[in-house]
Amino acid sequence: MNANVTVDDAISNVNLLDTLAIPDDLPDIEARALPLLYRSNFDTNFEDRSAFVTGIAKYSEEATRHAQFNDMLSEGLQHAANMYTWRCCSRAVPMAKSNDQPNRTEINEMVVEVLKPEVSKLGSFMRFTLTAIQRFCEEVRRLCHSEKRRDFVSEAYLLTLGRFINMFAVLDELKNMKASIKNDFSTFRRASQFLTAMSDTQAVHDMQNLSMFLATQNKIKDDLKLQMKTIEGYEELLCDVVNICAHMYEHQLYLSPNEKHMFVKVIAFSLFLMDGDAANVAKLDQKKRLSISRLDKIFKTLEVVPLYGDMQIQPFAFVRRSSHYEPSKWPLSDKESDRCHVNIVEKVQSIRSDHESYVTQFAKINNEVAICDRPGNDSENREITSLALSGIQLLCQWSCAVVETISWKLLNPTNPKDNRECPENAEEYERATRYNYSPAEKTALIQIIAMIKGLQSMLGKTESDMSNSTRKCVYVELQAFIHHTINEPLQKAVKHKKDLLASILQSVKDSISDAGNELNRMTDVKGKKKSSAPKGDSANSSSSDIRIPRRTAAPGSTQLYMARTQLESLISDKLCGGKKILRKELDSKTIEKISVFLRKSAHWPALFRLSDSMTEAGELSQLWFREFYLEMTMGQRIQFPIEMSMPWILTDYILSCNEPSLIESALYQLDLYNDAAQYSLFNFNKQFLYDEVEAEVNLCFDQFVYKLSEMVFTHYKQLASCMLLDKRFKAEILRSGTMIRSPSAARFESLLQQRHVQLLGRSVDLNRVVSQRVNMALLKALDAAIWKFESEPLSSIVELDMLIDTNRLCHTLLSDVLHSIAPFDDLFQEANHAVNSPHGRITLHVFWELNYDFVPNFVYNGSTHRFVRARHVFRKTPAREKPPQVGQVYYWGSKSLMAAFMNICNAYSQCIGTQHLKAITRLLHYQGIAVILDELLKMTNRLLNDKIRRHVRNVFNMMPKVCKLPRSDYGSNALLQYYVHHLEAVGKYPELKSEFCQDLRELGNMIVFCQQLEVALGQEEAHDLFLAAAYTGTVPQPPARNAQEQMKQLAKLEDKYSRIHLTEIIDKISPDDGQAAIAKDAELMTKERLCCGLNAFENFLVRIKQMLAADDIWTGGYPTNGVFWIDECVEWYRVYSALQFFLCQPTRDDNEVYAEELFGDSLQWGGLTLITLLGQHRRFEVLDFCYHLHRVNKADGKDEVISGIRLAKMVERIRRFQLLNNQIFIILENQLNENNDDPNERVREFAPPVHPNYANHAARRQ
C-alpha cells in the first residue's frame, strides 16, 4: 500500500465511488425487465439426428420429418403474422378519377410499384398453403397405410400434426377475415391490367388462381377436408390426435396459454375434418375410440378461445359446421352461455391463495439456499426444479384466466340496453372493451395481472440459479434413470435374448448416458467378479456402486426426443417394429418407472429454456392488439384512442377508483405495453406496430404521471389539512352530526420509490417525473392562495397564512417520498413573484389594502385591540381582481375540508387583530415590513401636509384668537355656554365631523397599525428566539437553593446542550474559517434581535415628529412670552380641544350617530399622537376645554340643558374620552421614553416673572 497518497488523490478516489452502480433497495412492484443479453438455445431442430447411430432407424426418420414440419410451421406462423398485421394500402394510394385523367398511367405505375411486394407475399402464402396441405396429406396417407395403421406414433409427432391442423385453421380464418387483403389485391390487379403488364400466360394464370384463392371463403379448410377424404382410415389418425390433445388438456400438460387453446382448437377442427360423407364421429364414439361426452365437457369448459391476436373463435363452431352434426349428442356445448366460462371475480380468490402459498414456499427455499455458502445437494436441486415448474404452471393458469376472459368479452360486446353506462353511439370495439367490464371484473383482472407479472419478476431474478439447479437435477435424474432403471431390464433382455427390446434399451442408454463406455466396462467387470452371486442381485450391485457426477449439463433436444420416443414405444399398446408389442415383455414396476420418467421429462425442454418459458406463460400482449376490430371499421379508424385500450383502461381504473390496494399494481398494467412491443418486434416483425405501441405508451405514460401526481398531491394535501385542523373543532362538528374524514391510507410510497421503471427499453425515474408534476401542483396551489388573497380584503391574510402552512406541511410530507421536489421556499418565492421583483405579490397587496381599504375604512377598538370596518365609509374601495377558477384540491384538498376551514377563517374575516398582524410579520418578514412602513410614512406625510394642514388652518381662522379658561366660580353651566359661544364658528365648519375626522382617523389607523405590528413582531421574534435557544447556547437558569448549586446545574446543562450548539460544532469540524465567522455573526444577530433596541414603532413616531417640526402651524411659532402659548389659539392641541368639545356633545336626535361609532378610537390616536409628538401633552391636559368643564362640573354637579346640550351627559362623555386619552398618552409616553438613556433632565432657565402692570410701566419709561 502506498503511504504517500495526497489528500487530493484520496478525495478523487472517494469521488470515484459515485460511478459504481449500486443496486437500489427499492420495493419490487414492477414486472420483469427483459435484458438486452444473448440467450442460449439448445433446440437444434433435429439437425444432429444423424449422430445417434445406435438409435432405431424409424425414429431417426421420424425426427427428419419432424424437423421438416417444424420448418413449415415456422413459415406458416410468418404468413399468419403477415396476414394479421396487414393494413389496407389501397385506401392510401391515389386513384384515377376518370379514364381521361392525363396522369392515370403514372398513378397506376405507382400503385403497381407499391403493391407488388405485398401481392408477392400473397402469392407465397397461396403456394405455401397448397404445399402444406399436400405435405400434410402425404404424411397422413403414409401413417394411414394398411401396414402402418397399428404402428406406434410418438406423442411428440402427434402433437406436431395437431399443430399443423391448428395452423390450417388459423390461416383460413385470417384469410376470411381480412377484407383489406382482397381490396389491395383488386386494386393491384386493376392497375396491372391497365398497364398490360402481365402479358405472360403463366402470370395471368397465377393471378387468376390467387384471385380465386382469396375470394373463396374457407378455401384452406375445404381443400384440406377434400383431400383428407381420399385417404382411407384418416379418421383413426385424427382420432389419435384428438385423444392426445384431450389428454394433454385434461391433465394440464401445457405450460403456456397458446398450448392450452391450441389443444381445444385442434380437437374441434379435427372433428370437423373427421366428419366426411358419413357420421364418422358418432361411429368412432360407438367404437369407443372417441368419447363425445368427454369432448363435450372440454368444449363447455372453454367456450371461447383466442384464434390469433384479438381474433376470437368458439371452438365448438367447427363441430356445428359439420354436415352430420347432431345437437342431442352435445347437450352441454350446444347451448351457448350468456356468461363467461371463467368467473374472474371468484377466480381471483383461489389465484390469490395459490400465489401466497407459492411465494411463501419460494421465499423459504430461496432463503435456505441463500444462507448456505455451498453448492446445493440433490434434494435442494430437486425442490428448486419442482418450484420452477410449479411457477410456470401457475403463470400459465393465471394467464389463461385473463386471456379467456378478455376473449369472451371481445366476442360478446355489451349493448346500451343491458348497460346503462354504454352510450348509444359507442363503437363496436368500445362496447367490447371500455363498457364491457364491471368494476369488480376490472379489479380482479388488475390483481391477477399484478400477480402474474410479480411472479414473473420474482422468478426472473433467480433465473440463473434456478436454471443451474434444474440442469443439475435433470442430469442426476437422467443418469440415475439410465443406470438404475434401465440396467436391470436391459440385462434381462440380453439374457433372455430379446434382441429388439435389448437394442431399444441399449439405444436409450447410449443416447443419454454421459460416460457410456466406462460405465459399461465397469458393469461388465463387476458382473464377472460376482458371477457366483444370485442372479437377481447382479444388476443391483453393479448399479449401486456407480457414482454419478453432479454436472450442470442438460440433454440436447434431439437427445431427449430420441430417448423419450423410444421409451414411449416400449410401453405403448401399439406395434413397435417387428410387429411386436414390447410392453408385454416388461414387468409392471419397470413400466411404472418409465411412465413416471416420461411424465417428468415432458416438461424438461421448457425448464431448459426457463426465461422463454416464463415469458410465454405470462405473455399478455393480446390485451393490446386490435387488428381485427380495426379491420371491421373499414378504414374509419386508423387506430383506436387510449380510452378503448385495455392496458390503459385498467391503469386508469387504478388511478380513479380510490382503492389503495390497487395502486401498487399500476406498473404491472403498463408492462402490458412491453409485452405488445416485444410481440410486435420479435413475433410479428412489424416496425409500424411497435411505433403504434410506442405512441400510445408516450401518451398513456404522460397521462399516468399526470393522474398519479394529482392523486399524490390530493392525498397529501388532504392529509396536511386534516393534521392542521383543530381537534376540538372536529370533535364539535362531529357532535353536531358532521364528520370530516381523514384520507384513507394510501400506498404511494412503494410506487413513488421506483427510480428505474422499464418501459419499451427506457429507464424512467418515476420519482423524478412525479416530483416535477407535484412541483407544478404546489406552485399552482401557492399561486391560487395568493390570488385568493389578492381578491379579498386584508382580513383574509389569516386564511393565506393557513393555506401556506398547509402547503408547507404538504411539502414536508411529500418530500419524504419525492426526493426531487424543489425546496418550499423556492416555490413560495416563485409564486409570490419575489424572484425577479424587489417586492412580492403579498407585500404589494398588503400595501394596496392598507392604502385603499384599511386606512380609510377601518376603525380601531382599543378594548379588543382590533380593527373593524366602519359603519359609514368615506372612501370607496376600488374593485379587486377576481381570482382564476381552480379546483378545491388546490386550496384545502376537498369540499368538506374547505367548508371546515372557511368556517374557521370566517371568524377572522370581519376584523383585523393580533392574528392578522402576526400573519403579516410571518409572510412579509423584515424586508416587506420595512417597505410597508416606508409607504405608510409617505402616506402620513401627504396626509399631514395636504389634508390635515388645510383643516387646521381653517379651524384656526374660525376660532377666537384668545380663549381663556373661565373661572370655576361661574359654574359648569356658564362654562358650557361660554365655550358654545366662543366655538360656535368652529362648530359650523362643514368638514369638521366628516373630512377632518376622517383624515385624523386615517392618521390614527396608520399609527395604531404600526404599533400593533411592532407588538406582533416582538412576539414572533421572542418565539423564534425561544426555539433557537438550544442551538445558540442560550440555556435558561435552572431553579436551585443557592447560587453555587445553580452554577453547577447550569454547567451540566451547558455541557449537555453544547452537542447541538451550531457555532461550536462548526468551529470543530469546519476547516473553513470563513464559515465559522459567518456562523458566529448569524448567532449574534439571532441573539441580539431584541437586545439592540430596534423598535419600528418608535422610529415611525420619530419620523412623524420630524415632519411636524418642519412647519410652525402645529406650534404657533415662538411664543410672545418666551415660554409657551397659554390662552392663544395657535397650537395644535387647541384645534384638537375644539374638535373634542364637539365630539363629546351628546346627540340631539335619535338618528344622529356618535363619532366613536364612525371613527372608533383611531381619531383620538391620530390627534393625541400629534399632541404627544409636539410636546403639548401637559398643556392639553391642563388647558383643554372639555377637561376644564369636567373639573368644574365635578365640583358643582350641575345639570342643565344649554343650547340643546344636556350638561350631565356631555360631562359623562368627557370622562370616557379622558380615560381613553390617558391610556393613549401612557402608551405613547412609554414608547417614546423607553430608550431615552439621557440622565440629564432637559432644564431651561427663565427670568423671574414680572407683573403685567410693572411691565407696562417699564415699557412707557423706555
Curated annotation (Swiss-Prot):
By sequence similarity, the record places it as follows: Belongs to the CYFIP family.
Q: Where in the cell is it found?
A: Cytoplasm
Organism of this sequence? Caenorhabditis elegans
Recorded GO terms, molecular function? RNA 7-methylguanosine cap binding; small GTPase binding
| The UniProt record lists the keyword Cytoplasm | yes
Assembly and partners are described as: Interacts with gex-3.
**Recorded phenotype for the gene knockout or disruption:** Embryonic lethal with cells differentiating, but failing to become organized. The external hypodermal cells fail to spread over and enclose the embryo, but instead cluster on the dorsal side. In one study, animals are viable and there is defective extension of body wall muscle connections or arms towards the ventral nerve cord. In this same study, double knockout with madd-3 results in severe muscle arm extension defects.
Q: Which PANTHER family match?
A: CYTOPLASMIC FMR1-INTERACTING PROTEIN-RELATED
What span is annotated as the signal peptide, if there is one?
Answer: none
According to its UniProt entry, the function of this protein is described as: Required for initial steps of body morphogenesis. May play a role in egg laying and yolk protein clatherin-mediated endocytosis by oocytes during oogenesis. Plays a role in the formation of muscle connections, also called muscle arm extensions, between the body wall and the motor axons in the dorsal and ventral cord.
An example of a Gene Ontology cellular component annotation for this protein is:
cell junction
Question: In its UniProt entry, what is this protein called?
Answer: Cytoplasmic FMR1-interacting protein homolog
Which UniProt keywords are listed?
A: Cytoplasm, Developmental protein
**Keyword Transmembrane helix belongs to the record:** no
Annotated TM spans: none
The segment annotated Disordered runs over 519-550
Could you tell me which InterPro entries the record lists for this protein? CYRIA/CYRIB_Rac1-bd, Cytoplasmic_FMR1-int
